[in-house]
Amino acid sequence: MTDVTVKSLAEEIQTSVDRLVQQFADAGIKKTETDFVSQKEKEALLAHLNREQGGSAGKPDKLTLQRKTRSTLNVSGTDGKSKPVAVEVRKKRTYVNRDAVEQAKAEEQAKREAEEQARREAEEKAQREAEAAAKKLVEEQAKREAEEKAKREAAEKAKRQAAESEKVTNQHTEHKQKPAQTDKTIQSEKARREAEAADLKRKAEEEMRRKVEEEAKRVAEEARRMAEENQDKWSSDSDSIDSDDYHVTTSRHARAAEDENDAKVEGDRRARGRSGKATRQKKNNKHSESKADREEARAVGRTKGKQRKTSTLQQSFNKPVAAVNRDVVIGETITVAELANKMAVKGSQVIKAMMKMGAMATINQVIDQETAQLVAEEMGHKVILRRENELEEALMSDRDTGEAVAEPRAPVVTIMGHVDHGKTSLLDYIRSTKVASGEAGGITQHIGAYHVETDSGMITFLDTPGHAAFTSMRARGAKATDIVVLVVAADDGVMPQTIEAIQHAKAASVPVVVAVNKIDKPEADPDRVKSELSQHGVQPEEWGGETQFINVSAKAGIGIDELLDAILLQAEVLELKAVRSGMASGVVIESFLDKGRGPVATVLVQEGTLNKGDIVLCGFEYGRVRAMRDELGREVFSAGPSIPVEILGLSNVPAAGDEATVVRDEKKAREVALYRQGKFREVKLARQQKSKLENMFANMEEGEVSELNIVLKSDVQGSCEAIREALEQLSTDEVKVKIIGSGVGGITETDATLAAASNAIILGFNVRADASARRVVENESLDLRYYSVIYSLIDEVKQAMSGMLAPEYKQQIMGLAEVRDVFKSPKFGAIAGCMVTEGTIKRNNPIRVLRDNVVIYEGELESLRRFKDDVNEVRNGMECGIGVKNYNDVRVGDMIEVFEIIEVKRSIA
């Protein structure tokens, strides 16, 4: 190993140079900062440091290492969105010195053996002492009895000797006479005394044996009592030994639960063991069979007396025998995987259930709430439908609506009618301005919102387009209005858009005031207008109805005051009121993207007061009102009910018809707007997927359908919606209009790139392309078209679609010839001699051979001759010879029909 300097070594081990030099000095090695350090010197320094830290005293018994690993995991939630979740994996590993552990176990074992030996010695000593005491007691008793017996025998002997001596003295003569009889008496007396002594000895031995047995019983009783008193201590020691064998977890609570489970299992085994069912139990539980045997075999060695302790480990899991019905909470949309997770079943089962119900889905497909409810109920679960707009409801409830005192407000009047019937001109005269001249083509293409002051009060007018493409804009105007003024030209009568306006007014339950315009024209016929409108449910007051009819002339100014009076009279009948104080709410009439000001929305305030600086939640968009302007472009700072204003400051262009609401918290408004965007997208995708799957067989033929891709940009949101709807209605079975992208504002480079990628044409309605977009258009040779009138746009799209239609081919009969005779030719076979009866017979045209007006062959001419000369055509009334290619069965009387196929150009109706 290469030697290193002291300085580099200090940097390597992350310590100061001075400290390292001092440690070398303490180890007996003198070093400076620039000196080299060899491997031996490093080992010497390490040994010195180990000695200082007590490393030589012995190795540590236990070493614990911890490691943390951090990562990020994307987890999908209940709303279907992926959220990054930080995951930290903590690993802990403990290394144990086996020598120390074995030594500790050996010491513990020796200690337990010593205690057991001491206990046994104590029992043996107590037993020996009891036996010695009993033996000593028996010996003393026997000694006392022997002494007493000896005294009694001595006294009796003395007494007998005295009696005998007296008897001997008195009967000396008799003894002398009978010596043989005296010897016999002495022997019998001696035998009697020996028998009495043996009997006394036997009785003493029996007494001693009885006392020894009683003492042994007493000692055994004391030993049993001692064992009962120390049983808890000894069993706890034994359990601590056994716990190392069958505890497989380190948690205290888990060990307690495991002990309870084992005790329960042991109780069941003892109850079943007597009936001989333990074997079947062991076979039924495959998980515990081998381990239970090992535990029982291990427990045999610990058996004491008649007590047995077995500890078995088995995982008691029983398969559910009945279906589990769950409460499934379903939001507005849910994926198939989430639905399966809530029902605790596999995703494949949910897909099978949906296929049985006639719906096809994939595991990650988003389905709507209704479909999910049907599937869950079909599978036997209880469904709880959840509304996921709690945040939105909380935000809407936290609004200051003031004291809720309703005050009279100005009526909102919508002017409807057929195109060119004079709606805008009538409004111009009322406002004394010239708005109609500013509209392209003289037709209204936006919703104009104006409020005018009259002598009788203020009136807010909404001018809607009359063109058929602006149906949604007229419907939107009817929803936001109080009174509809239906303008009908006296010289034109009721037209399709007039009927449509009546339907919108009836659907919105809005009263109608009919203004019969162009009354100054000579061909005007007001009675005809009344008659035609009465056929559609609009009855004039003169005929017993409820609708006011006012004859007006927008150019001459006839009947304008009467019309305003009729409007105000109708407003008085309606008793229109609104709350002026508090937070405002209204509806978006129109919206567009201004290049200098950003998103601009025309809002009609319906309740409250809209102030500059308020936070507005408008459909999918939100923002703070940075500026407000009236219809004349003047800046205003507040707007009350029935006042239309343009507001600036929204995050994007809102959709026309969205409800605009003032809220308190901008942060919550942003959350609600984002939630609405996501939910709208999910619901839209769910519906699209559902329609695609339901029309699966129809979609198989889509590859044969031509598509006209369009990128559409408009100046305002309402016009964009109207054009989009009109273009989509142009689609046919053969050519479909596909709107690749649409929006409000100028044509940008992004739009041009999108059109290039999708092979689409770019349509601009009252907008222009910027420089970068024009550059992309030139480089990619894209089709870019500008329009200012909707008629021209729709007509040109129709022409483009007509060019994409498959051509239609038509057969046109050129001539007819009758076969008069048949000749044989070695070169062409059968030659038909014919007379041309109609038209002209031309060479190389397809022909048909007819027999009895039935086509029997279709082919082409091979030879056409007149007087043995080849000719190109034969006119009517002339004879010729015709050779049919690959056909020789020509007969007299057949008709030969010559035709040609012409292409017919198709167009979109």
UniProtKB/Swiss-Prot annotation:
Residue ranges of the region described as G1: 417-424
Binding site for GTP: 417-424, 463-467, 517-520
Compartment(s) of residence: Cytoplasm
One Pfam short name: GTP_EFTU_D2
Region described as G5: spans on this chain: 553-555
Region G4: start-end pairs: 517-520
tr-type G domain segment(s): 408-577
Ranges of biased composition (kind: Basic and acidic residues): 99-177, 186-236, 255-270, 286-299
One Gene Ontology term, aspect cellular component: cytosol
Record keywords, A-Z: Cytoplasm, GTP-binding, Initiation factor, Nucleotide-binding, Protein biosynthesis
Biased composition (Basic residues): 271-285
Region Disordered: start-end pairs: 49-314
Residue segments, region G3: 463-466
SUPFAM superfamilies: Initiation factor IF2/eIF5b, domain 3, P-loop containing nucleoside triphosphate hydrolases, Putative DNA-binding domain, Translation proteins
HAMAP family: IF_2_B
Role this protein plays: One of the essential components for the initiation of protein synthesis. Protects formylmethionyl-tRNA from spontaneous hydrolysis and promotes its binding to the 30S ribosomal subunits. Also involved in the hydrolysis of GTP during the formation of the 70S ribosomal complex.
NCBIfam families: IF-2, small_GTP
Entry-linked PANTHER family: TR-TYPE G DOMAIN-CONTAINING PROTEIN (PTHR43381:SF5), TRANSLATION INITIATION FACTOR IF-2-RELATED (PTHR43381)
Name listed for the protein in its UniProt record: Translation initiation factor IF-2
Organism: Photorhabdus laumondii subsp. laumondii (strain DSM 15139 / CIP 105565 / TT01) (Photorhabdus luminescens subsp. laumondii)
Gene: infB
